[in-house]
Amino acid sequence: MVYAQNYAELLQTHIDSEADITLLYQSVDNAREEFINCDILNLNKQKGVESIEKNRGSAQKRNIFMDTYIMKKELFIELIKKARKISSMYTLPQIVNSLAGELDIRGVAHRGFFASITDFNSYYNANISLIDFKTADALFNPDWPIYTRTNDSCPTQYLEGASVKNSVISNGCLI
C-alpha cells in the first residue's frame, strides 16, 4: 500500500471513538477491475466493521482495507495468541474478522492518494499515475517528506538520440 497519512490524527480519532480496534480504508469505485484479492471492509452505517473479506471483483464500490490497525498493545498480543492457537497460518485480518461481533472495530476513511501494489500491472499503474502533478502533489507533500530515495547513486544519463515521454525514471539509469 502506498499512501500518506497523519497517524497522530488517526490515533486521536481512535482514542476519541473508544473503539477496541480502528482500521484504515479507502473507498473506491473500481473494485470490479482493480484491487482483486485485497481485503475489503464491510461497514455498517456507523462505520463499524462487520467483516473483512477478499475482494473478488463482485462489486464496483468497495472499502479497501489499507492493512493499517490501531489497537492497544495488550489486545494485539492477545489476538496473536488466539490466532496461534487456531493455526500458525492464521493472519491478523482473519483473527480480527473472527472477533468482529465481539470487539468494537471501527473503520476510518482515508483521504488522498492511495495505491495498492499487488502485481506488476498495479505497480506500473501506480507509478504512471504519479506523472500527473496533481496526483503526485497529493502524495508528496513538502511538510510530510517521504524518505525512500538514495542520494549516493549517479543521476540518470540520457545518451544521444534518447527520447523519453511520460516516464518515471530512477537515478542510475542509462537511456
List the predicted regions and their residue ranges:
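Conserved core of the sugar-phosphate nucleotidyltransferase
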Residues: 5-83
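Left-handed beta-helix
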Residues: 74, 82-175
